[in-house]
Amino acid sequence: MLLLPGSHVKIVREVNKVPNIKSAMKRVELTRIRTLRNKAIKSSVKTAIKKFRTALEQGDNHNAAVNLRQAIRAIDKAVTKGVLHPNTAARKKSSLQRYFNKTTA
């Protein structure tokens, strides 16, 4: 932290601290790897949902039904990998199914 003379403004500098302890270094590396994996899984879920929504908005009910199953499968996989909480997954699946039912009815 740096305090400029004659002012009350503090400038905080962020410093990437690298741990010295071997186990802490390993935890940092594992966190980085898991973050990348979680991002990839979340991205696949979002992509599946977008495919479903675009198919439904184009009026292709058959393709939308196929994409709905794929989106639900991607959401369930994210739950088994520990990326999404089960309640979050249930909420997403429910909203997708309601949207499908409302649009195709």
From Swiss-Prot:
GO terms for biological process: translation. Keywords: Ribonucleoprotein, Ribosomal protein, RNA-binding, rRNA-binding. Binds directly to 16S ribosomal RNA. Coiled coil: none annotated. It comes from Moorella thermoacetica (strain ATCC 39073 / JCM 9320). Pfam families: Ribosomal_S20p. GO terms for cellular component: cytosol; small ribosomal subunit. Belongs to the bacterial ribosomal protein bS20 family. The keyword DNA damage does not apply. PANTHER family: 30S RIBOSOMAL PROTEIN S20 (PTHR33398), SMALL RIBOSOMAL SUBUNIT PROTEIN BS20C (PTHR33398:SF1). This is Small ribosomal subunit protein bS20. InterPro entries: Ribosomal_bS20 (IPR002583), Ribosomal_bS20_sf (IPR036510). GO terms for molecular function: small ribosomal subunit rRNA binding; structural constituent of ribosome. Gene3D superfamilies: Ribosomal protein S20. It comes from the Bacteria.
